[in-house]
């Protein structure tokens, strides 16, 4: 990476680009019959980013990254999901 005319050593980028498929809650402020209320469904969602962390409790991705002047990686636009709502993680090329 070139900074101010000097080449800085950048550490290897080791994070995989992924697409998450996850379920989100849906709320409705309207008055509904019981039958219509029971027919409501949750929402299927997709997000893409770089996989920062995954364990049995949570999944964390980030969408933006930058290497600081000293070569350290900084990340932005992080999203943390409860593991229970993430239904599939697809590694992208």
What are these regions (language model features)?
Residues 2-93:
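Conserved RNA-binding domains used in RNP assembly and mRNA/RNA metabolism
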């Amino acid at each position: 990476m070139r900074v101010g005319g000097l080449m800085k050593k950048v550490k290897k980028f080791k994070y995989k680009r992924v697409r998450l498929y996850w379920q989100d809650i849906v709320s409705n402020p309207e008055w509904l019959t019981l039958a219509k209320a029971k027919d409501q469904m949750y929402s299927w969602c997709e997000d893409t980013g770089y996989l920062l962390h995954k364990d049995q409790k949570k999944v964390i991705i980030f969408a933006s990254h930058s290497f600081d002047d000293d070569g350290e990686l900084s990340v932005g636009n992080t999203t943390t999901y409860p593991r229970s709502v993430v239904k599939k993680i697809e590694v992208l090329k």
